[in-house]
From Swiss-Prot:
Its EC number is 5.2.1.8. Gene3D superfamilies: 3.10.50.40, Nucleoplasmin core domain. Residues 122-256 are annotated as: Disordered. Residues 241-252 have a biased composition (Polar residues). Belongs to the FKBP-type PPIase family. FKBP3/4 subfamily. Residues 123-174 have a biased composition (Acidic residues). GO terms for molecular function: molecular condensate scaffold activity; nucleosome binding; peptidyl-prolyl cis-trans isomerase activity; rDNA binding; RNA binding. The modification Phosphoserine is found at S192, S249. Pfam families: FKBP_C, NPL. This is FK506-binding protein 39 kDa.
Amino acid sequence: MSLPIAVYSLSVKGKDVPAVEESTDASIHLTMASIDAGEKSNKPTTLLVKVRPRIPVEDEDDEELDEQMQELLEESQREFVLCTLKPGSLYQQPLNLTITPGDEVFFSASGDATIHLSGNFLVDEEDEEEEESDEDYDLSPTEEDLVETVSGDEESEEESESEDNSASEEDELDSAPAKKAQVKKKRTKDESEQEEAASPKKNNTKKQKVEGTPVKEKKVAFAEKLEQGPTGPAAKKEKQQASSNAPSSPKTRTLKGGVVVTDVKTGSGASATNGKKVEMRYIGKLENGKVFDKNTKGKPFAFILGRGEVIRGWDVGVAGMQEGGERKITIPAPMAYGNQSIPGIPKNSTLVFEVKLVRVH
């Protein structure tokens, strides 16, 4: 599957305007040809395209092709009409034309108007060798909960082992002063009763200093903590904090053109507003659940919001999102591709996108 990586645009006026100034490994998918509504001339303008194989130039000595190679290029060259636009009646024409890296393409406009082409640079998904970054598509909520649960269990086990070790060390400290007291008691049998009475008191004071909190009390407190489990004071506090940070139930709204958005997760970063460049992750589906396009790894899909670089449903549905936010956008056919049929999308299709806003520039 091909993935869009950048917006393509070209203004054509006159003859033999190259599709790209330099060779590129990416294909070009043309989706629209249009003219400015402010064109003064009312004459129609026809867009022609000339296609021929690209000949790699490996050496400066090869820059001038010999006559035989030139004849071969002319024989294999194809030229055809893409569309005809006329100010006042026809301002734009949807296209579905892919230019591969192996083709050398030139556009010509036979008329007074300037024709503007737009589309996307594409790369094959299997050709992407970039490792997945931190900005790759997030885990689903259930997977995140599972990771947090496992982490929490490991921390609890470490805490339990730490407290058990602490209790063992205190038991050893308890036994040491007890033995010392017994030895001292044997040595002081013949001393006066006053000295015998003072000796235990001194030993008890020393024992309390060494012990700090009695071991029994610590063990009881630790047992109570285990018995309390998730209903203990600390757990209640954590639960309250988690519930306060947890997102509320998804909010669904209907926007311009019948576009329906559901905020699955509210972001906390910069807001997406018209004129700003946004970087997105997305999965595009038909109403039957069939995936026709996606961008879940590698370089995020980027475009300028509100400039018409994407279908109108995206300009409407993405507006207002914040960095880190996730949203489900349901786009009716008139706000998508209408009665136009493109690969993977039948005409008059309602499209469903699950999107995440990665960054706002």
